[in-house]
Amino acid sequence: MEQTNCLYDKFPYETEFDGTILTVTPSPKHEGCYEVVLDQTLFFPEQGGQTPDQGQLVVSHGMRPQTEMNVLDVQIRDGVIYHLVDTPVEVADHVHGKIDWDYRFSNMQQHTGEHMFSGIVHSTFGYNNVGFHLSDSIVTMDFDGVLTAEELMEVETRVNQVIADDLLLEIAFPTPQMLETMEYRSKKELEGPVRIVAIPGVDVCACCAPHVKRTGEVGILKIMQVQ
């Protein structure tokens, strides 16, 4: 199956989109639910430690009334994005999608904050982020080294200075030749096009998730707990 056109790569601040249903299959894991594949989507799937977008699909059935349904989950397999819904729909139906902007923007803020924190830890102390999970209200990060309380406070202070500097993020898909000479963080070996998210002077990292345009949009970063 052809890979889904991921609109969130280019348009992370858009909240609505139109698409066409390509396939509808019963969910193998959720009884009474269906996995819907669209030609394009704004819904970011669960991947890279980040929870999926939330929102609705409004499906048009020709002359029949429209059907509005919640998107219960979003997964990606082999580049194809599957939207989990509990209402049957038909192939070739037109879809108008609407994502929950507050939820999306919160994820963008938290994910960009994680990049700043991890980038400063890596460049200053040489430790790598080896685990990351983003939930509704908190981000957890695992590093392959131990930071002292003083070092953690230093990182927190520097991150908040980067936020205050309101730097513009740079996002690109470098060619394989460019990637060979580029230093960037990545937790795994990557295949296919690689999306690079750069915060000038702070971090360069391979990442598939939506981010804020400027660091100032993160607001503030605060360390809540250390284990």
Residue ranges and their predicted role:
Residues 1-227:
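A glycine- and charged-residue-rich anion-binding loop/surface
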